[in-house]
Amino acid sequence: MIENPSPSAANLPEHPSTDASHPRNIRSFVRRTGRTTVGQAKAFADVGPRFLLAYKAEPLDFAAAFGRVAPTILEIGFGMGEATAHIAALSPDKNFLCCEVHTPGVGALLKRIQEQTLGNIRILQHDAVEVIDNMLPAGSLDGVHIFFPDPWHKKKHNKRRLIQAPLIAKLAARLKPGGYLHCATDWQPYAEQILEVLSAEALLKNTADASGGGYAPKPDYRPLTKFENRGIKLGHGVWDVVFTRV
């Protein structure tokens, strides 16, 4: 299941509509440009063969991929991998399956893995929705992290947002009973949509009480990234939404 793809995003598909009325067209990303650094390219060569998994339209063998059986957390869109590496270091007893299509971000996380000697992360450089559909069996996950997905601020672009009912239904089905789904955003209108969508999913239950408006306190495991700290200093809010599988 392991490959070392070339650190190039040239062949990534464009972002189609993610309108909830067309669930087959949901994608977890939009195309972005960016260059890998020398250090990131070196990490691809040095540790990519071990930590990058090949996408295949068949159920993933978690034990083979990670070399052990352990609770598995899916992360969708890890950016430059800062929070991912922090959480993985705090939880060596858990496996982290991380999806990101943007090559500089993948290279950055590989570099962190190498520098911090993290053995519990595996990366799929592929659209997360196809990974969920074709590689993750029902009841296979212990948790899901979706931190700061693109908010698509303009109303006409809201339909492109990742967190919509079709995707949440897929994720809920793949969580084990008692597993959790944790979303975080710094855009209040998106936070409201996330809360509404997750609340409407029958297989999920909110962990927060009404006193917080349905939003959860920031879990200790999620670090404040440089980006988030910058936003807080500018007076921006951050909303965490944490639901569990019933």
Curated annotation (Swiss-Prot):
<feature type="region of interest" description="Disordered">
    <location>
        <begin position="1"/>
        <end position="26"/>
    </location>
</feature>
<feature type="binding site">
    <location>
        <position position="186"/>
    </location>
    <ligand>
        <name>substrate</name>
    </ligand>
</feature>
<keyword id="KW-0808">Transferase</keyword>
<feature type="binding site">
    <location>
        <position position="75"/>
    </location>
    <ligand>
        <name>S-adenosyl-L-methionine</name>
    </ligand>
</feature>
<dbReference type="InterPro" id="IPR055361">
    <property type="entry name" value="tRNA_methyltr_TrmB_bact"/>
</dbReference>
<feature type="binding site">
    <location>
        <position position="100"/>
    </location>
    <ligand>
        <name>S-adenosyl-L-methionine</name>
    </ligand>
</feature>
<feature type="region of interest" description="Interaction with RNA">
    <location>
        <begin position="156"/>
        <end position="161"/>
    </location>
</feature>
<keyword id="KW-0819">tRNA processing</keyword>
<keyword id="KW-0949">S-adenosyl-L-methionine</keyword>
<comment type="function">
    <text>Catalyzes the formation of N(7)-methylguanine at position 46 (m7G46) in tRNA.</text>
</comment>
<dbReference type="InterPro" id="IPR029063">
    <property type="entry name" value="SAM-dependent_MTases_sf"/>
</dbReference>
<comment type="similarity">
    <text>Belongs to the class I-like SAM-binding methyltransferase superfamily. TrmB family.</text>
</comment>
<feature type="binding site">
    <location>
        <begin position="225"/>
        <end position="228"/>
    </location>
    <ligand>
        <name>substrate</name>
    </ligand>
</feature>
<dbReference type="InterPro" id="IPR003358">
    <property type="entry name" value="tRNA_(Gua-N-7)_MeTrfase_Trmb"/>
</dbReference>
<feature type="binding site">
    <location>
        <position position="127"/>
    </location>
    <ligand>
        <name>S-adenosyl-L-methionine</name>
    </ligand>
</feature>
<feature type="binding site">
    <location>
        <position position="154"/>
    </location>
    <ligand>
        <name>substrate</name>
    </ligand>
</feature>
<dbReference type="GO" id="GO:0008176">
    <property type="term" value="F:tRNA (guanine(46)-N7)-methyltransferase activity"/>
</dbReference>
<protein>
    <recommendedName>
        <fullName>tRNA (guanine-N(7)-)-methyltransferase</fullName>
        <ecNumber>2.1.1.33</ecNumber>
    </recommendedName>
</protein>
<feature type="binding site">
    <location>
        <position position="150"/>
    </location>
    <ligand>
        <name>S-adenosyl-L-methionine</name>
    </ligand>
</feature>
<dbReference type="GO" id="GO:0043527">
    <property type="term" value="C:tRNA methyltransferase complex"/>
</dbReference>
<comment type="pathway">
    <text>tRNA modification; N(7)-methylguanine-tRNA biosynthesis.</text>
</comment>
<feature type="active site">
    <location>
        <position position="150"/>
    </location>
</feature>
<keyword id="KW-0489">Methyltransferase</keyword>
<dbReference type="Pfam" id="PF02390">
    <property type="entry name" value="Methyltransf_4"/>
</dbReference>
